[in-house]
Regions:
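Active-site-adjacent substructure of cysteine-protease-like catalytic cores
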Residues: 47-107, 111-112
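Short amphipathic alpha-helical surface micro-motifs
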Residues: 26-27, 47-50, 74, 118-124
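Cysteine-nucleophile protease catalytic domains, especially the papain-like/related folds used
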Residues: 1-50, 55, 61, 131-156
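Noncatalytic regulatory segments and standalone regulatory/sensor domains
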Residues: 24, 83-84, 93-156
Length: 156
C-alpha cells in the first residue's frame, strides 16, 4: 500500500486486496503484487538475487523497493535462514552504513535489519501448492513520487 501511495494512487485497501487476490492462508503472491502495480500503471522492475547494496542504490535514486522476507515467526519455527513459512512484505525506504530501514505494515514504527540479518531472512515461498522459492526478491518502483507531504484534509 505504501508504494501505491508514494506513486499517487488513492484507492481503498479492500479494493487493492481484492485486485491482488489476497487470501488469509497464502497472503498475496508476487505475481498478483505485480498485477496490481501494472493495473495502476506503475513502472516497476522486479528481480531475484538482489543485495543490500542494490537497495541502497535504489534509495539513493529515490526509488522504494518492496521485498519479501521472513519475519514475525513463532518460537517453534526453524531459524530464519531455514524458514520459508513466515513470509512478509516490507518496503525499503532508507539505510544506514550497516542496516536497511523499512516501512513495515506490521509495525507502528519503521523497522530495520542489519545487512547480515536481511541476507539470512531474504527468501520466501510464493504461496499456493508447490510454490516457487524466491531468493533476494525485490520490486523497485521507478514511477516518480506523486505523494504530497503537505496535503491535509478535514476528517468528516
Amino acid at each position: 500500500m505504501s508504494m501505491l501511495v508514494f506513486a499517487g494512487v488513492e484507492e481503498r485497501e479492500q479494493r487493492i486486496l481484492k485486485l491482488a487476490k489476497t487470501d488469509k492462508k497464502d497472503g498475496t503472491s508476487v505475481e498478483n503484487i505485480l498485477f496490481v502495480f501494472g493495473y495502476f500503471g506503475m513502472d516497476v522492475v522486479a528481480r531475484e538475487h538482489m543485495t543490500p547494496d542494490d537497495l541502497r542504490k535504489a534509495v539513493d535514486g529515490g526509488h522504494p523497493t518492496m521485498l519479501t522476507l521472513q519475519a514475525y515467526r513463532d518460537d517453534k519455527a526453524p531459524a530464519y535462514k531455514d524458514d520459508f513459512d513466515d513470509g512478509h512484505y516490507v518496503v525499503c525506504i532508507g539505510y544506514t552504513e550497516d542496516a536497511i530501514i523499512f516501512e513495515d505494515p506490521a509495525s507502528f514504527h519503521r523497522t530495520f535489519l542489519s545487512d547480515g540479518e536481511l541476507i539470512e531472512r531474504w527468501h520466501d515461498c510464493d504461496g499456493g501448492t508447490n510454490p516457487p522459492k524466491l531468493n533476494g526478491w525485490g520490486c523497485t518502483l521507478l514511477t516518480p513520487s506523486a505523494y504530497k507531504h503537505d496535503l491535509t484534509e478535514h476528517m468528516d
